[in-house]
């Protein structure tokens, strides 16, 4: 798998960003370092890649049993939202969030994974809607329509589950000691 382009809108601390892995400085080298001060958005970049590919992130998995009260939540029926719900990465006071990842799979097919979520009626106080997560060819031809299909198809095309991807591709914050063991 090779990343080509990452487009982020309203994910955690990032309002808008487009990272081109094929042109400019990132296109010239096969390896690069993500660095910056605390809070600069380094982990958010990795979260965005994981959201597009797997509809979850390492830091959400770490908070699997934590919940908070959100009177605008429409899914649980209790107003409680799990901290591990991927839609919780929507930037505060935004009405929608999206990640678009352009990449080539193990077979060399050019693909585009899109993860998005929005609030009802495009209002900041609107209820958070269901995540929409799709996979298509880069020419726009859809390959999946449902989240379960998207997960299965991405895992098949990349050849890695979320856990395998995390172990082989990135090291989440707080996981370095575990990695050394």
PLM region spans:
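Extreme N-terminal "head/tail" segments of very large remodeling/mechanoenzyme assemblies
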Residues: 1-170, 174-177
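Cytochrome P450
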Residues: 179-181
């Amino acid at each position: 798998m090779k990343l080509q382009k990452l487009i982020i809108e309203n994910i955690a601390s990032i309002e808008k960003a487009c990272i081109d892995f094929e042109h400019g400085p990132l296109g010239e080298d096969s390896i690069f370092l993500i660095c910056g001060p605390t809070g600069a958005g380094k982990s958010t970049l990795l979260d965005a890649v994981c959201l597009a590919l797997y509809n979850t992130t390492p830091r959400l998995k770490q908070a699997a049993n934590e919940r908070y009260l959100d009177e605008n939540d429409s899914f649980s029926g209790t107003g409680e939202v799990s901290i591990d719900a991927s839609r919780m990465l929507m930037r505060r006071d935004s009405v929608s969030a999206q990640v678009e990842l352009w990449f080539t799979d193990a077979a060399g097919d050019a693909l585009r994974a899109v993860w998005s979520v929005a609030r009802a009626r495009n209002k900041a106080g609107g209820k958070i809607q269901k995540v929409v997560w799709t996979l298509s060819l880069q020419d726009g031809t859809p390959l999946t329509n449902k989240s379960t299909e998207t997960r299965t198809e991405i895992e098949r095309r990349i050849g890695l589950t979320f856990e395998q991807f995390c172990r082989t591709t990135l090291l989440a914050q707080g996981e370095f000691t575990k990695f050394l063991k």
